[in-house]
From Swiss-Prot:
It comes from Tropheryma whipplei (strain TW08/27) (Whipple's bacillus). Part of the twin-arginine translocation (Tat) system that transports large folded proteins containing a characteristic twin-arginine motif in their signal peptide across membranes. TatA could form the protein-conducting channel of the Tat system. The gene is tatA. This is Sec-independent protein translocase protein TatA. The chain crosses the membrane at residues 1-21. Belongs to the TatA/E family. Keywords: Cell membrane, Membrane, Protein transport, Translocation, Transmembrane, Transmembrane helix, Transport. It is a single-pass membrane protein.
Length: 93
């Protein structure tokens, strides 16, 4: 496929971004983009660690994750209340 963007393409894209957002907003925009990339990278690494631990490999700190069967299931009060109200509604029909 070759090189899709040449230097001129990137220059035009940069010029359009400056015209759309203005020079006063660019620092805020770039900070937001960098922060979003950091969050994405952190989430991706956490997901990779979970996948590795499920395959029997330790995460980045050398710890193995607990299997889903060893983690107890705890119902919240809201779930119990909601289930009770749904059951009552069905009985009243």
């Amino acid at each position: 496929m070759g090189n899709v963007f040449s230097g001129w393409h990137l220059l035009v894209i940069l010029l359009v971004i400056v015209l759309l957002f203005g020079t006063s907003r660019l620092p805020k925009l770039s900070k937001s983009v960098v922060e979003a990339l950091k969050i994405f990278r952190r989430s991706f690494n956490e997901a990779s660690d979970i996948t590795r631990s499920q395959d029997g490999h330790p995460d980045s700190q050398g710890n193995f994750a607990e299997s889903a069967s060893s983690v107890p299931f705890v119902k919240s009060e809201k779930q119990s209340e909601k289930r009770a109200s749904v059951t009552e509604a069905k009985k009243s029909k």
